């Protein structure tokens, strides 16, 4: 299925296999995702299930959003997310229903989407792994400078996309083909092998792997 869930990164730990091997895992807390809308080909041009999770104070929900949540009969959440549906998929879903960690199973391969940690304005050495220039040998000002960023009269410009200093992090990042080590339906937890983008407490979307 292409249906995933939205959870929160709880942190990292390790678990041990039967052979005694230690596996680093990310723990993702997945509260039941409340279905707010089912999009159809006839009304929206594509099929998708829209969900929300968490809660938000009523004073922070505008009238349009409040009406949208009320129509589905669900509590206002901290955001809305969509999962595309293939033909014949999600026929058993309905607005007001819930998606839980039970949509996944142990050993399944998934993609994790999160917002990476913001690093602020960074130079080329940190942002792009540029090599540093000489510390001595006559170099007194350009230790971490990028060096030449172009050529001469031809082309007479700096090409678009040139790697330079700038804002680093705080961008949507997808890590593909992570394995679900354990599904804990009782405590609404997913244990995913390896690292997942973002800070502890950040929202993470877990969905079946595209390239598995």
Swiss-Prot record:
PROSITE patterns: RIBOSOMAL_L3. The modification N5-methylglutamine is found at residue 153. Methylated by PrmB. One of its GO terms (molecular function) is structural constituent of ribosome. The keyword Lipid metabolism does not apply. Keywords: Methylation, Ribonucleoprotein, Ribosomal protein, RNA-binding, rRNA-binding. One of the primary rRNA binding proteins, it binds directly near the 3'-end of the 23S rRNA, where it nucleates assembly of the 50S subunit. Part of the 50S ribosomal subunit. Forms a cluster with proteins L14 and L19. Belongs to the universal ribosomal protein uL3 family. This is Large ribosomal subunit protein uL3. It comes from Marinobacter nauticus (strain ATCC 700491 / DSM 11845 / VT8) (Marinobacter aquaeolei).
